[in-house]
């Protein structure tokens, strides 16, 4: 028999708050976390704005020496996982370590280390790179460091699917628990790629917004949208088998009841114009959850503020939800957080969970004039109080990746 899977812990480090409570408070205020780049000298870059984590202080969880050896993407991941672990009130005796998994991923991994060590290799010779280079660069060491820290000896399986990576990782952790292989799992993602190489790589693809006004930079579904704003951060959820959570007296935030994943098999960066893969992904999640389209109250959209994504994602929502697409609330929180790439799905899943708890939909803050083909209720400007019993989070990624999760109050 399939097991029930619930969320018992949340952790986040984001451009609008370095813990879950602060992030949510700022989300409800419509705080814009986008600003001028400070993590590197962007004076010669075509792109000068990003959504950075501010006043990063890892000292609550990591001593200065340890943090100094780790790539920023790993530090962010450890911080979010630590908050989630504490929030869930887990302890070494609370779970069988071999039934405790880690599904914490990244879209790109340790790009800060890749960039800095490549500069060292060019300037001083390849044999002068740091001995920590490889372990800081590879994606599985985000989750690997978390599993070592908390003695989670079950599978460490980061699903790497670009900007849907953490959504897929949460979905696969869900399946492992639902099918009886695990009792508890860290699930989510971390990203920190705001450096000269990361910004340039996306900029030359014309994927990034290149203006210099943070208030008008990330404008999902807006007529004037022109590209995404790179963000950084981490989000981790504790997924737990329901009976296991009840037995230890854990508080339960919400239940995860559906997961869908597809590939467009169409193009390396562009979504399929027909929205077939996007819509099928949501349909699979609904089937998995045993819900009708009319059951969904809120969709946290991928909503990147790129011309293609927002138009095609809107089409996909209409194809699945029909007339109900105009009755439910949709929003993109990327106007506040920027696009956190492989971490975005985890942070947006946390937003869905908090929406269920608080019965409120977070806003799309920067959008003022909707594009004609984007005509849904995108919750513009301010949060909306409404009944939210089922929330769907969808994320898309380069390579035609599509992933959707459904959470139940």
Language model features with spans:
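Active-site-proximal alpha-helical scaffold in enzymes
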Residues: 77-90, 139-143, 147-191, 229-250, ...
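Glycine-/small-residue-rich "gating" segment that lines the acyl/pantetheine channel
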Residues: 123-130, 171, 175, 191-247, ...
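A glycine- and small-aliphatic-rich helix-loop capping segment at beta-alpha/alpha-beta transitions
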Residues: 21-28, 112-126, 176-179, 199-212, ...
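Conserved beta-ketoacyl condensing-enzyme motif
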Residues: 7, 23-24, 28-161, 190-199, ...
